[in-house]
């Protein structure tokens, strides 16, 4: 079975990339159980708590990330350098229980996946 990685690199609500990535992630979960989810660059904003998308008249799809463990998707990683570059503390509460890793460690984890989809 192919190992599939989803890499979120774009901020939420500025484009549909994050929402489309989440939809693809949920659909893929029906086909394989070996899924890894990575948050890099502006993608780290996808899983920050306390967002209020309704204030900009956007749909709140961020809360859907919370249900991923119900679909047996429970491998999440966040780039430590991306958090630091954006002034976000590594210990800030996230929507998901994600492990914070260095860029080198993320690259190593990502190298074990057969398919990489970027959103």
Curated annotation (Swiss-Prot):
It comes from the Bacteria. Heterohexamer, formed by a dimer of trimers. The hexameric TusBCD complex contains 2 copies each of TusB, TusC and TusD. The TusBCD complex interacts with TusE. Its main location: cytoplasm. Gene3D superfamilies: DsrEFH-like. SUPFAM superfamilies: DsrEFH-like. One of its GO terms (cellular component) is cytoplasm. Keywords: Cytoplasm, tRNA processing. NCBIfam families: PRK00211.1 (NF001238), sulf_tusC_dsrF (TIGR03010). This is Protein TusC. Belongs to the DsrF/TusC family. It comes from Enterobacter sp. (strain 638). GO terms for biological process: tRNA processing. It is found in: Cytoplasm. Part of a sulfur-relay system required for 2-thiolation of 5-methylaminomethyl-2-thiouridine (mnm(5)s(2)U) at tRNA wobble positions. InterPro entries: DsrEFH-like, Sulphur_relay_DsrE/F-like, Sulphur_relay_TusC, Sulphur_relay_TusC/DsrF.
């Amino acid at each position: 079975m192919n190992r599939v990685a989803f890499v979120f690199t774009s901020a939420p609500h500025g484009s549909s990339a994050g929402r489309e990535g989440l939809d693809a992630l949920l659909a893929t979960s029906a086909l394989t159980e070996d899924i890894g989810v990575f948050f890099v660059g502006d993608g780290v904003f996808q899983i920050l708590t306390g967002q209020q998308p309704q204030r900009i008249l956007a749909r709140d799809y961020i809360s859907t990330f919370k249900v991923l463990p119900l679909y047996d998707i429970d491998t999440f990683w966040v780039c430590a350098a991306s958090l630091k570059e954006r002034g976000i503390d590594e210990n800030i509460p996230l929507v998901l229980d994600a492990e914070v890793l260095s860029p080198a460690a993320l690259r190593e984890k990502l190298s074990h996946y057969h398919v990489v989809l970027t959103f």
